[in-house]
Regions:
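Non-catalytic structural scaffold of enzyme domains
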Residues: 1-279
């Protein structure tokens, strides 16, 4: 039986990337409690099938609900692309129709119209997100005049997950994909980082990006969207506890997660171990 008491806002990601979403949300909405769950043991999600990503994501969402969350944000583009709609339409009516699961693709698609002059936009993301064409569909729905080009970056998530973001190898893989997307459409003037891991590669991305091309990370736009959502849905906002606390959980090595999280968040964190079901 799920608790009806107010609880933390859940943030789920396949690994460390969702920390960029959590950081953006906490900057804007510091008063709430948060519960972050990283499925590092099964990362990356990008190459996995729709069915597997859906099942892994569903397991995580259910666990976060069991731990008291009434609202869960999928801080993972692959999960948002491959699992969100199925969970919202098929699972939530059975689990608890009063609880909510939100994704992070639409908030970025909503604002991109104000961030491009050329109306040519690039998306750098995982293989799964690019194949799903979720960004193309959302942007075309909201901004039919924008042309979207996407490139998959299969090695970028492992660079972050294995703490190689500052390595010479990172230079090679980042430059390769930046060059590829600019060849694909030289008129691009805004690039969406369609994976929450990618802002952790920002120094490399900026190093190789042509002048005049804007990088669009998602954190601040997701935070703005979440604030508006809570304002529009007071019945959900009242179920989000306000103690300004954060609890971190990982399915892999808590010590490794702690080290990585502290590097990015610039604050000490305590990390707990958690197990999710396996296929």
């Amino acid at each position: 039986m799920l608790s009806s008491k107010a609880g933390p806002i859940g943030i789920f990601d396949s690994g460390y990337g969702g920390l960029t979403i959590l950081h953006g949300i906490r900057q804007l909405l510091p008063q709430y409690d948060y519960l972050y769950l990283g499925d590092n043991a099964r990362a990356p999600y990008g190459p996995r099938s729709f069915d597997v990503v859906y099942e892994f994501t569903r397991q995580a969402v259910v666990r976060l609900f069991e731990m008291g969350c009434h609202l869960v944000v999928l801080g993972c583009n692959t999960a948002s692309a491959k699992a969100l709609r199925s969970i919202q339409q098929l699972d939530m009516p059975k689990i608890d129709p009063e609880r909510r699961v939100l994704g992070i693709i639409r908030p970025t698609a909503e604002v991109i119209g104000s961030l491009t002059r050329s109306r040519h936009v690039g998306v750098l993301a995982t293989e799964g997100t690019i194949k799903s064409e979720s960004y193309n569909l959302e942007i075309q729905k909201l901004h039919p005049d924008i042309q979207v080009s996407g490139v998959a970056c299969p090695f970028w998530v492992p660079l972050v997950e294995y703490n190689e973001a500052d390595s010479p190898g990172a230079d090679y893989f980042v430059k390769k994909r930046i060059d590829e997307i600019m060849r694909k459409d030289p008129l691009i003037d805004a690039i969406i980082l369609g994976c929450t891991h990618y802002p952790l590669l920002m120094p490399k991305i900026l190093k190789f990006l042509p002048d005049g091309v804007r990088v669009v990370p998602q954190g601040e736009y997701v935070a703005d969207s979440l604030r508006e959502y809570l304002n529009r849905h007071p019945q959900i906002e009242q179920k989000c506890s306000q103690g300004a606390s954060v609890r971190y959980m990982t399915t892999e090595n808590p010590e490794k997660f702690k080290e990585q999280a502290q590097i990015f968040l610039h604050e000490p964190v305590e990390v707990e171990s958690i197990t999710l079901g396996n296929l």
